[in-house]
Amino acid sequence: MGQKINPIGFRLGINRTWDSRWFADNAEYGQLLHEDLKMRKFVMDELKQAGISKVVIERPHKKCRVTIHSARPGLIIGKKGADIDKLRKKLSDMTNSETHLNIVEVRKPEIDAVLVAQSIAQQLERRVAFRRAMKRAVQSAMRLGAEGIKITCGGRLGGAEIARTEWYREGRVPLHTLRADIDYGTAEAETAFGICGIKVWIFKGEILEHDPMASERRALEGDAQGPASRDRDRDRRRDNA
């Protein structure tokens, strides 16, 4: 079961939380859901070069709060904040409500599954050898503190006549363990030979407390910690186990 299901959906309510955080009655639920989908697609398409990891949407009373997690926040903000004001206005027009926009920097894009998948897809589109792109991503993630990573690429790799799937794994990726903090991301590379699909799983350690916000809080705290501090935490968890 853990091998097939989306690892993020599998852990929702345990150590992961939803990217859309709001409640609505039956009459307006569908409309708000489609607004979320439109906003996410718009942000992902409009800010493709900014390295968007995820878009979190919250809806306090008759307002909308959008948090964009980006590896390159400077591209979103623009010169003297001009670009972010334009983006805020466009999102407000989509929701017909007051929209607040927050930008959160992803300090280590090498261990963010969505950004790793996007990076590999961009390399495949530039005709970089898929094995080299995958190995480079694996080495970077392990060097920056990931406890395990698995990458699969599927399609007409290298222009082959018959599509196939290749994968690399290093370290542990325990998909069945619910307390494991596993990040998952996908991307598509539009090559001259057709579309190649990329999937990335990154194991960042175990979360022992039962807290849906634990993974998000840990990511923010991890940006402030150095590698030595993370190693001490990992050793402490192993001793307790």
From Swiss-Prot:
GO BP field: translation
Region (Disordered): 214-241
SMART domains (alphabetical): KH
One of the record's GO molecular function terms: structural constituent of ribosome
Positions with biased composition (Basic and acidic residues): 229-241
Domain KH type-2: 39-107
Subunit details: Part of the 30S ribosomal subunit. Forms a tight complex with proteins S10 and S14.
Name under which the protein is recorded: Small ribosomal subunit protein uS3
Source organism per UniProt: Rhizobium rhizogenes (strain K84 / ATCC BAA-868)
